[in-house]
């Protein structure tokens, strides 16, 4: 079988490459061309290419999107939430001090966030490190409350799974722009714990704000209890 002419032109070069702030693809002529970006569309990868984050640690980073808007990106395994992520959530709650006017929480990964790192929580529980667990929960609650009442707009842009703590991050945002393929829910009961970053009260608030809810408090709250107790995701 003869080798196609295109592959002869390619040789040992990659079909795609990145240089500086641009991404390139190889044309049928064997030359590189800049990957076009549709007007009004962007990916975080385009912002990150050739730039340095405003703030960063092992779990998350804050990027400058331009026009006074920052983006918080979680980049742990499966975008799970650990102490590094919580620390960067706290940092994101004061980005106005660095001149930013708005915050977007999102990433280019398949999943927004699968929630807390259960493995770390299990390790701490088995070691009876109760003060550590209590402090972790408190810091997570405080971080999300700062975002909820931030003096600037906070937009969550979930795609894929936003479960447990990931869902609670979305619930803390002032606005949500969700991908069509998004799956959200407070699923902590599935592993034997209850939502700890404020998601329970956020669901209650939304249930009570629903003008079409049944009369009285309990009928509306029963739906919230059912959703949490059955680890429902939608």
PLM-predicted stretches and their roles:
Residues 1-110, 119-139, 145-152, 162, ...:
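N-terminal glycine-rich phosphate-binding loop for ADP-containing cofactors
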Residues 156, 160-166:
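Gly/Ser-rich catalytic serine loop of serine hydrolases
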């Amino acid at each position: 079988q003869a080798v196609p002419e295109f592959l002869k032109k390619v040789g040992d070069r990659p079909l795609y490459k990145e240089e500086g702030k641009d991404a390139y693809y190889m044309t049928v002529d064997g030359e590189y061309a800049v990957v076009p970006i549709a007007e009004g569309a962007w990916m975080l990868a385009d912002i990150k290419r050739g730039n340095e984050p405003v703030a960063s640690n092992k779990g998350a980073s804050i990027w400058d999107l331009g026009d006074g808007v920052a983006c918080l990106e979680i980049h742990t395994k499966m975008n799970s939430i650990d102490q590094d992520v919580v620390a960067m959530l706290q940092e994101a709650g004061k980005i106005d001090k660095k001149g930013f006017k708005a915050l977007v929480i999102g990433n280019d990964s398949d999943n927004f966030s699968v929630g807390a790192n259960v493995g770390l929580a299990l390790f701490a529980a088995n070691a009876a490190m109760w003060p550590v667990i209590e402090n972790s929960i408190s810091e997570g609650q405080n971080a999300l409350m700062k975002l909820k009442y931030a003096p600037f707009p906070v937009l969550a842009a979930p795609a894929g799974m936003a479960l447990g703590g990931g869902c609670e991050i979305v619930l803390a945002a002032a606005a949500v722009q969700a991908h069509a393929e998004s799956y959200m829910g407070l699923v902590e009961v599935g592993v034997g714990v209850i939502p700890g970053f404020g998601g329970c009260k956020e669901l209650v608030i939304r249930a009570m704000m629903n003008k079409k809810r049944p009369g009285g408090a309990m009928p509306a709250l029963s739906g919230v209890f059912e959703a949490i107790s059955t680890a429902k995701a939608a």
